[in-house]
From Swiss-Prot:
SUPFAM superfamilies: omega toxin-like (SSF57059). Reversibly blocks N-type calcium channels (Cav2.2/CACNA1B) in rat dorsal root ganglion cells. Elicits no toxic symptoms in either vertebrates or invertebrates during a period of 48 hours post-injection, when it was assayed in vivo by direct injection into mice and cockroaches. This is Hainantoxin-X.3. Belongs to the neurotoxin 36 family. 02 subfamily. Transmembrane segments: none annotated. Disulfide bonds join 39-56, 46-59, 55-64. Residues 21-37 form a propeptide. One of its GO terms (molecular function) is toxin activity. Expressed by the venom gland. Keywords: Calcium channel impairing toxin, Disulfide bond, Ion channel impairing toxin, Knottin, Neurotoxin, Secreted, Signal, Toxin, Voltage-gated calcium channel impairing toxin. It is found in: Secreted.
Length: 65
């Protein structure tokens, strides 16, 4: 009887950990806290606030600085 309980607990732990790992991998791509922030390096052309990817620094005279 005790062996059946131990096996049941071990199987449940395995199922729960596999389920949690699967969800943590899918959440990682969706989380804005984990995603790397993309920005344009200095010297690249920029167009102010209407561009999709901002400058890493400041957009000055249509160039990132």
């Amino acid at each position: 009887m005790n062996m059946k309980i131990l096996v049941l607990v071990a199987v449940l732990c395995l199922v729960v950990s596999t389920h949690a790992e699967r969800h943590s991998k899918t959440d990682m791509g969706d989380s804005p806290m984990i995603q790397e922030r993309k920005c344009l390096p200095p010297g690249k052309p920029c167009y102010g606030a209407t561009q999709k990817i901002p400058c890493c620094g400041v957009c000055s005279h249509n160039n990132c600085t």
